[in-house]
Amino acid sequence: MTNGNGTPPEAAPAPQLNVLAQYTKDLSFENPNAPSSLQQQGQPPQINIQINVGANNLSEQEFEVTLSVEGKAETAGKVMFSFELAYAGVFRIVNVPKENLHPLVMIECPRLLFPFAREIIATAVRDGGFPPLMLDPVDFVGLYRQNMERQMAAGGQAGQA
């Protein structure tokens, strides 16, 4: 294929996603009923996990993405442990069409952060006296769709990165 004058057209620059930094913004672990919570329990605890993603534009090409993970383990109505983690990264994204930017920031960036957040949580729970909590993989596409549907239902504007 040529561009009309016999020369091949120039290829569009390839999309790029670079991780510039990763860091813990906030970490809290509570073991409010220790040492009794550390004794063998008759049944496994009920564990509830909530995961959210937020993003801030730092510049036209740089974004801070924060993966927030909160969890609580309870047995017989007593809290065994709870935690909150805000783990963030700064990402440079270039040569990506504007219509693809928001999904990239809100799906791929947290997907890159998740293994590190998972390790921090597993270590914090283990250091709190419990077996390490290994979070299940997260469907960031599904989470993104849920958030977009929620925004649309609330009359918000989706698609802003």
Curated annotation (Swiss-Prot):
The answer to whether keyword Membrane applies is no
InterPro entries cross-referenced by the UniProt entry: SecB (IPR003708), SecB-like_sf (IPR035958)
Q: Keywords in alphabetical order, please.
A: Chaperone, Cytoplasm, Protein transport, Translocation, Transport
Keyword Lyase: yes or no?
A: no
- What protein family is recorded? Belongs to the SecB family.
How does this protein assemble? Homotetramer, a dimer of dimers. One homotetramer interacts with 1 SecA dimer.
Could you give a single Gene Ontology term from the biological process aspect? protein transport
Gene3D superfamilies given for it? SecB-like (3.10.420.10)
Q: Name one GO molecular function term.
A: unfolded protein binding
Task: Note the Pfam families from the entry.
Answer: SecB
Q: Tell me a GO cellular component.
A: cytoplasm
- Enumerate the HAMAP family for this protein: SecB
Q: What protein am I looking at?
A: Protein-export protein SecB
| Role played | One of the proteins required for the normal export of preproteins out of the cell cytoplasm. It is a molecular chaperone that binds to a subset of precursor proteins, maintaining them in a translocation-competent state. It also specifically binds to its receptor SecA.
List the subcellular locations: Cytoplasm
